[in-house]
Amino acid sequence: RINGAMIDEDYVCRFTEEAQSLVEKYQPSFFELTSMMAFKYFADQQVDVAVIEVGLGGRLDSTNIITPMLSVITSISFDHTQYLGTSLKEIAQEKAGIIKHKIPVVLGPGLDKDTRSVFYRKAEDMEAEYLEAEYNSGITKLERTPSMVYSIHHKDIKNLSFELRGDAQKE
């Protein structure tokens, strides 16, 4: 999306046709292919800033090819364990792969001491400033509808829309 507008269907069709030989040759995953399309679309549209949410997360994520202005790590949980590891420390080590040389990183409040130390170490190795997000963002979810209503510091905001509607997006 750019300014809330979805990529138009014609662009998706043209991209699919143009990328067909690459798809046959490299057999990218669906996420890799849609990331590639999004990056091309953002470049074609000359966006000033793009907010990119990782899929797998970390070192192996297809979004990790970009050099961000800022990286954010909100939380660590047991997801994608077949790729990232079976302990929170192993998963944190993989997810720390998004920390880039001299690029600031924001660490979410839900990280425990052990995983947080993995990110501190990686940030120091990469000479990246790290910042700690405060625990209470003031955002609470009030209703679960297509256009959710959120309360931010006791002020209701209606029709605030997120493509994904989970607690991770609230963070």
Language-model features, listed with the residues they occupy:
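Phosphate-binding loop of NTP-binding sites
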Residues: 1-100
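Adenine nucleotide phosphate-binding catalytic loops in nucleotide-utilizing enzymes
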Residues: 2-28, 82, 86-92, 100-171
